[in-house]
Amino acid sequence: MSDNIISFDHVTFTYPDSPRPAVSDLSFAIERGSWTALIGHNGSGKSTVSKLINGLLAPDDLDKSSITVDGVKLGADTVWEVREKVGIVFQNPDNQFVGATVSDDVAFGLENRAVPRPEMLKIVAQAVADVGMADYADSEPSNLSGGQKQRVAIAGILAVKPQVIILDESTSMLDPEGKEQILDLVRKIKEDNNLTVISITHDLEEAAGADQVLVLDDGQLLDQGKPEEIFPKVEMLKRIGLDIPFVYRLKQLLKERGIVLPDEIDDDEKLVQSLWQLNSKM
């Protein structure tokens, strides 16, 4: 039996003055320790889901729906308990900075939890080191690059030891190299701390590395499954305005020409190896 750390059960949420729900009758589960990519076009409800998970928003009717995080059912009396379990890294890290230095910013969440200063200093130093920013501990966040700022934002979340990290379009403003560095960092942190990661993105290249993909369209769950189950559905993804990852685009073109590659070919390295093997047999 799987151990689900997050579950949505018939969740509907409508923003004030909106004529229609942002998410409608949404039900899904996320397994503990997994990496889940939540994909969809702009306005599909992705970021609304992240705010619902963290209790920043509440379902329209808690009597008809429920959100459970790490065994705690979200409600008015449990919202702070849930927020301690979930950390969000947003698209623009500048909106998250509150400290004059990197160390001050990472310490902010610990100060709110009244962590004793000697213990806090140790935690901050470790978190800053874990994200590769020890040399910038006394620097002003405003002087850092975009990738460095995201590292600091991740350190601030890591310091308070959540069970879940949500990346809410947090790599969308980075160049390809910076994006891959941040994703590699989060993968390492996930494994080292047995965290659950939710990546909210419209970048399917990023989503290709997830354990599970949830596809949202107009606030509803359109499909879900492993990347190798979702990405071959080229017409569905095109219909909702998403760009297919290169590997899957090429596999589709080859298939149309009678060359069918195995389902497990899901990244560039495997693709190149498979094509070399195919060429050697010709």
From Swiss-Prot:
PANTHER family hit by this protein: ENERGY-COUPLING FACTOR TRANSPORTER ATP-BINDING PROTEIN ECFA1, HEAVY METAL TRANSPORTER
ABC transporter domain location: 6-243
Species of provenance: Lactobacillus delbrueckii subsp. bulgaricus (strain ATCC BAA-365 / Lb-18)
Protein location: Cell membrane
SUPFAM superfamilies in alphabetical order: P-loop containing nucleoside triphosphate hydrolases
Top-level lineage group: Bacteria
Gene3D superfamilies on file: P-loop containing nucleotide triphosphate hydrolases
Keyword entries, A-Z: ATP-binding, Cell membrane, Membrane, Nucleotide-binding, Translocase, Transport
Function of the molecule: ATP-binding (A) component of a common energy-coupling factor (ECF) ABC-transporter complex. Unlike classic ABC transporters this ECF transporter provides the energy necessary to transport a number of different substrates.
Name recorded for this polypeptide: Energy-coupling factor transporter ATP-binding protein EcfA1
Coiled-coil boundaries: none
Topology term for the membrane: Peripheral membrane protein
Residues given in the record as ATP binding sites: 40-47
Enzyme class: translocase
Keyword Transmembrane helix: no
Protein family per UniProt: Belongs to the ABC transporter superfamily. Energy-coupling factor EcfA family.
GO MF term list: ATP binding; ATP hydrolysis activity; ATPase-coupled transmembrane transporter activity
EC nos: 7.-.-.-
